[in-house]
Structures are given as structure tokens and as C-alpha cells.
């Protein structure tokens, strides 16, 4: 049987909890990451207690000095949780009492509950975490942009259904991976508006009767506002679920980039060679160069999705207000951040060191009759209805396929035999360069458009960097 010594809640109980309950309740193995935030919030709380007349100036200063000492010891690792500590809050109260005594140290708990305390600390931690994750995502975007800038005219096969479809610029394709990642960063930045609401002062659920000032502590801790409803503030974790969704979306977007790299690095595609420092070998096959980073990105995306699903399942159908189920809210989010902090630098390094075989891509770009759409649209520009033009282009493909040649190899007579307006002039679009250059509308794959896209990606990235530094 455990004792209640050092517990934040033992007065009502004659005995301590059963050992199995104590083990089940323990959370210091994961919530210790909140310790620095707990110290900062406790200092703000001491100042609020002083302004409310609940501490003398001497008591306030003594608590602040003790918290400064405790914070330094937490930072350098000389103070940590004991086996007997239930959670980060109890461990830090123990540390504070060791430094300032039980009478003074015990005064800090006035006006706050672990319910509002942990909800506040979780938000503080998460607001910092999303900035670190966003920085990592922007590094991947920067690597994609650098590769796009290095290959402004390289042409590759564009695909739908993994089948050759139309020629596109490699830079266009790379930037197509950058845009969803930038939207993820936008989601993180937008999420911060909802995370920047402080639950502090809500108490267990009903608020405080001690004359505390939630707005003052919210401002001191860098929040935009204090919560409007104390029950909602202590019981809701939609902010955690929203963050977990964005983290999982980042994982999904990285997994699509990863899948492209995996395919491109195969012998069958042959688009890229992986740098030695960003790939691995085989313990039995000497020739292998494996895309482990990309494969781990695919795998970790599943883990991130699982963290989101698990968190949503935990939150489902909980009655108001706080329930102990919410002890399970942090580990999925902590894990998602930890996985992304491992993955994002590796993905940036992988992308930044890819060596593209532009000749191979250019050779494959027209194969599979990828210029057929250009034939149809060439006819449309000459007044032929698209339905008819589509049929004519399809007939040209069928004729070339029957002879085992490309569209460009059909004789002039064969072309006009398919459709009278399909003259020799169509050959101006029967090159991959002509095809790419013709797609000069906004968002298209023409070099002028892709250059604009690259500039926009870089400008947007920089705006996000500035915004996230605030």
C-alpha cells in the first residue's frame, strides 16, 4: 500500500492508494516535459496571489526565489521526479517545499487545481511545439524549392493512376509537394489562435472565489485571452485533437512525397539516385541502396494517424467536466511531435541531396503517348469540337500503337486520313517541350508559370517564418 505523503489530495483518505492504483495513476514518465512550463506558470501564479492579497511581498519573493532555484535544477537535470511522485505537479511542489519550507511552499496551491493547471501547461507546451514542427516542415519545403530552382526546364512524365499522362516540369511536380506542406504550416499557425486561450484560474471546474485575475495571468503567460467558461476550459481537449490532426496531415503529405521518392529511386523508374548519407544498405545484398527515410516516413504517417484516432476515441462521450480519462490526452500528442521532430530533418536532408537523372526523365516523358491531349487541344484551337478532337487524337494513338511508333512518327497522310484538319502543323505540339510550353495558364507547367510558383512558395515560406517567430 502506498502512502499519501507528498500527495496533492490525501487529506480525505485514511490510507494511501493501493500499489496497483498508484502505478496506474503515475504520469511522470511522460508529463515531465511540462516541468519547465509548470515552473513558469507557478511564478505567474505567485504574482497573481500577491496582487489578490493572498501573499505578502516577502512570501511572494520567497516563492519566486524558490521557483527560480527549482527551475534551474529542472533545466540542468539535477532535480527530477521520484518513484513516489504521482505527476509533474506533485513532484515540483515537493521540490519547492524542499527549498522554501512546507508553510510557504504550500501557499502556492491556493486558487488552482491540477485541472486548470495541466490544461494550461499543455497549451503552453503545444504552442511551442507547433513552432518547432512548422520550422521543420518549412525546411522540407525549402529543400523542395531548392531542387525545383536547380531544375527549371527538366521535363518528366506526369502521371495519373500511376500511368503516364502528360509531360510536366520536374520543378512543377516538386512544388506540388511543397504546397500541401505550406497549407499544413498555415493550419499550425491558425491553430495557435485557438490554443492561445488560457484555462488558468478555472480551478477544478467552477472558477475561483479568491479574487484571482485570469486575464492577468493569461497575459503574463503569453496567451491572447483567458477562457470564457471555466467548465469548458478544464474539460475540453479539442485543441489537442486539432493539433494531432495537423500532425497526422503532415505525416500523410510527407508519405506521398516519400512514395514518389521510393518509386523514383527504383531501377524501373531510375529518376533519382539517393545520396549515400541519406540511404542504407543490405546486410546480405551488397548492391542495395535502400530509401529507408522515405519508408520510415510512410510508416510514421500511420503512427501519427493512430495517435489522432486514439485521442479522439479517448475524448468521445466524456461527460463534463474533467475526467481522469484526460490523463491519456498528452502521450499521443507528445509522441506525434517527437516523431515529426525525428522525421522532418531527415526528409529535408533526403530531398535536398537527391540527384536527378534528367536525361532519363526526358527520355521517358513522351512514352505512353503522353502528347495525345496536345493533339486534341491543337484541333480544338482550330475550331474542332472537343468530342471530335478527342476521338481523332485517340485514333492517332491507335494507329501509332498498331505500328509500334510514336505519334510524331505518323506520316502526314496518316494524320490527315484520321481527320482532315490534322495537318503537318500539328507537329509543333508533338514535342515534350512544345507541350509543356503551351500550358501557360496560371498554375500550369510552362516554365514561366512554374517560375512564378517557385517565387510564391518561397515568399509564403518566409511570411510563415516571420509569423511563427512572433
From Swiss-Prot:
Q: Which InterPro entries match?
A: Arg_succ_lyase_C, Argininosuccinate_lyase, Fumarase/histidase_N, Fumarate_lyase_CS, Fumarate_lyase_fam, Fumarate_lyase_N, L-Aspartase-like
The UniProt entry, under SUPFAM superfamilies, shows: L-aspartase-like
Please state what class of enzyme this protein is. Answer: lyase
One Gene Ontology cellular component: cytosol
Q: What is its main location?
A: cytoplasm
- GO biological process: what's one of them? L-arginine biosynthetic process
Gene Ontology molecular function terms on file = argininosuccinate lyase activity
- PROSITE patterns referenced in this protein's UniProt entry, alphabetically: FUMARATE_LYASES
Pfam families attached here? ASL_C2, Lyase_1
Q: What is its EC number?
A: 4.3.2.1
Q: Which parts pass through the membrane?
A: none
Q: Where in the cell is it found?
A: Cytoplasm
Pathway of action? Amino-acid biosynthesis; L-arginine biosynthesis; L-arginine from L-ornithine and carbamoyl phosphate: step 3/3
Q: Give the record's keywords alphabetically.
A: Amino-acid biosynthesis, Arginine biosynthesis, Cytoplasm, Lyase
State the reactions this protein catalyses.
2-(N(omega)-L-arginino)succinate = fumarate + L-arginine
Q: Which family does it belong to?
A: Belongs to the lyase 1 family. Argininosuccinate lyase subfamily.
Which HAMAP family does this entry report, sorted A to Z? Arg_succ_lyase (MF_00006)
Q: PANTHER family recorded for this chain?
A: ARGININOSUCCINATE LYASE
Query: What protein is this chain from?
Result: Argininosuccinate lyase
Which organism is this entry from?
Answer: Mycolicibacterium vanbaalenii (strain DSM 7251 / JCM 13017 / BCRC 16820 / KCTC 9966 / NRRL B-24157 / PYR-1)
Read off the lineage from the record: Bacteria, Bacillati, Actinomycetota, Actinomycetes, Mycobacteriales
Amino acid at each position: 500500500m502506498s502512502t499519501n505523503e507528498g500527495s496533492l489530495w490525501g487529506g480525505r483518505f485514511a490510507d494511501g492508494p493501493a500499489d496497483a492504483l498508484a502505478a496506474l495513476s503515475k504520469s511522470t514518465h511522460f508529463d515531465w516535459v511540462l516541468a519547465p512550463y509548470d515552473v513558469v506558470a507557478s511564478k505567474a501564479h505567485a504574482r497573481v496571489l500577491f496582487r489578490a492579497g493572498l501573499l505578502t511581498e516577502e512570501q511572494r519573493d520567497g516563492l519566486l526565489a524558490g521557483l527560480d532555484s527549482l527551475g534551474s535544477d529542472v533545466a540542468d537535470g539535477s532535480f527530477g521526479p521520484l518513484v513516489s511522485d504521482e505527476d509533474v505537479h506533485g513532484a515540483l511542489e515537493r521540490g519547492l517545499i524542499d527549498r522554501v519550507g512546507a508553510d510557504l511552499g504550500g501557499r502556492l496551491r491556493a486558487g488552482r487545481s491540477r485541472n486548470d493547471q495541466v490544461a494550461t501547461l499543455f497549451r503552453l507546451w503545444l504552442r511551442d511545439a507547433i513552432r518547432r514542427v512548422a520550422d521543420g516542415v518549412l525546411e522540407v519545403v525549402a529543400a523542395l524549392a531548392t531542387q525545383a530552382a536547380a531544375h527549371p526546364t527538366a521535363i518528366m512524365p506526369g502521371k495519373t493512376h500511376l500511368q503516364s499522362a502528360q509531360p510536366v516540369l520536374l520543378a512543377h511536380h516538386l512544388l506540388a509537394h511543397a504546397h500541401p506542406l505550406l497549407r499544413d504550416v498555415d493550419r499550425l499557425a491558425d491553430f495557435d489562435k485557438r490554443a492561445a486561450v488560457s484555462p488558468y484560474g478555472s480551478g477544478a471546474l467552477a472558477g475561483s472565489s479568491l479574487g484571482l485575475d485570469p486575464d492577468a495571468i493569461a497575459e503574463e503567460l503569453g496567451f491572447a485571452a483567458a477562457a470564457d467558461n471555466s467548465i469548458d476550459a478544464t474539460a475540453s481537449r479539442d485543441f489537442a485533437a486539432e493539433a494531432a490532426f495537423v500532425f497526422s496531415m503532415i505525416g500523410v503529405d510527407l508519405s506521398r512525397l516519400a512514395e514518389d521518392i521510393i518509386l523514383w529511386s527504383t531501377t524501373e523508374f531510375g529518376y533519382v539516385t539517393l545520396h549515400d548519407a541519406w540511404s542504407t544498405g543490405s546486410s546480405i545484398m551488397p548492391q542495395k541502396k535502400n530509401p529507408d527515410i522515405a519508408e520510415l516516413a510512410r510508416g510514421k504517417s500511420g503512427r501519427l494517424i493512430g495517435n489522432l484516432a486514439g485521442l479522439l476515441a479517448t475524448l468521445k462521450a466524456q461527460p463534463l467536466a474533467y475526467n481522469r480519462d484526460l490523463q491519456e490526452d498528452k502521450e499521443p500528442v507528445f509522441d506525434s511531435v517527437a516523431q515529426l521532430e525525428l522525421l522532418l530533418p531527415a526528409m529535408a536532408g533526403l530531398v535536398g541531396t537527391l540527384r536527378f537523372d534528367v536525361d532519363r526523365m526526358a527520355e521517358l516523358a513522351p512514352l505512353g503517348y503522353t502528347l495525345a491531349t496536345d493533339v486534341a487541344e491543337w484541333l480544338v484551337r482550330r475550331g474542332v469540337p472537343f468530342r471530335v478532337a478527342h476521338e481523332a487524337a485517340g485514333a492517332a494513338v491507335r494507329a501509332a500503337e498498331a505500328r509500334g511508333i510514336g505519334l510524331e512518327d505518323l506520316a502526314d497522310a496518316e494524320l490527315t486520313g484520321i481527320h482532315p484538319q490534322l495537318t503537318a502543323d500539328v507537329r509543333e505540339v508533338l514535342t515534350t517541350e512544345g507541350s509543356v510550353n503551351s500550358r501557360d495558364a496560371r498554375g500550369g507547367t510552362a516554365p514561366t508559370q512554374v517560375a512564378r510558383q517557385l517565387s510564391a512558395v518561397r515568399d509564403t515560406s518566409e511570411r510563415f517564418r516571420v509569423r511563427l517567430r512572433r
